[in-house]
Amino acid sequence: MLYFESLKDKFKLNKKQLNKFVFYYEFLKKENQKMNLTSLISLSDVCYKHFYDSLILKEIFDFNNVTNLCDVGSGAGFPSFPLKILYPHLKIIIIESSLKKINFLKQLASHLELDNVCFFHKRVEQHDIAKNGSYDFVVARALARLEIILKWCVPLVKKRGYFIAMKGKNFQQELEASKKIIKQMKVKLVSAKVFELPMQLGTRTNLLFQTE
């Protein structure tokens, strides 16, 4: 429980939230044996490379003022499900191309009693254009090169809304290569937050953009 206690202390989790993260880990570990949801399945990896990495977004943005969050390429639910546990008021929209991951997330949402979660089984570039400009906040974690995910994700963001690209430590080259598309899509880089995961498990960068 040491890893979970560190999450509790860092992110001020209550007992109910902490229990949900414990269940999340156990359910992910169990289902991963059947369907290969993630290669990072040790307790330390899940707690820090998945849960911590997701929850740290609260340090660069106040999600209390966000109504809906669209997670593009959510995989096993990161970062949207940890954020939903922390901020139960959020409406979560999942866009995921893998049906097995969608089915896993539907089961997990039911077990965790997470309401107001919508699922779209499709690639983001196939998402209904009528949904463009619908979302307060869009996030993509380790999905593709920055210039590609900007093209995919920015159209989903409402006017004056936000998009976060979750990247590793070598983000500068991608950012440089994306200057043209950033200008074309009329978004501005608000912040680039670099942080270290606990136990020297890696460096992460969260790039926060705002639409005009």
Curated annotation (Swiss-Prot):
Give a GO molecular function annotation for the protein. rRNA (guanine-N7-)-methyltransferase activity
Classification via InterPro entries: rRNA_ssu_MeTfrase_G, SAM-dependent_MTases_sf
Q: Does the keyword rRNA processing apply?
A: yes
Task: Give the residue range of the signal peptide.
Answer: none
Q: Where in the cell is it found?
A: Cytoplasm
Primary enzyme class: transferase
Q: DNA-binding: present as a keyword of the record? A: no
Q: Where does S-adenosyl-L-methionine bind?
A: 73, 78, 96-98, 124-125, 141
Its Enzyme Commission number(s) read 2.1.1.-
Gene3D superfamilies tied to this protein: Vaccinia Virus protein VP39
**Listed GO cellular component terms?**
cytosol
What would be one Pfam family of this protein?
A: GidB
For this UniProt record, give its keywords in alphabetical order, as a comma-separated list: Cytoplasm, Methyltransferase, rRNA processing, S-adenosyl-L-methionine, Transferase
What does the UniProt record say this protein does? Specifically methylates the N7 position of a guanine in 16S rRNA.
Which PANTHER family has this protein been placed in?
S-ADENOSYL-L-METHIONINE-DEPENDENT METHYLTRANSFERASES SUPERFAMILY PROTEIN
Family, as annotated: Belongs to the methyltransferase superfamily. RNA methyltransferase RsmG family.
Q: What is this protein called?
A: Ribosomal RNA small subunit methyltransferase G
Q: What organism is this sequence from?
A: Aster yellows witches'-broom phytoplasma (strain AYWB)
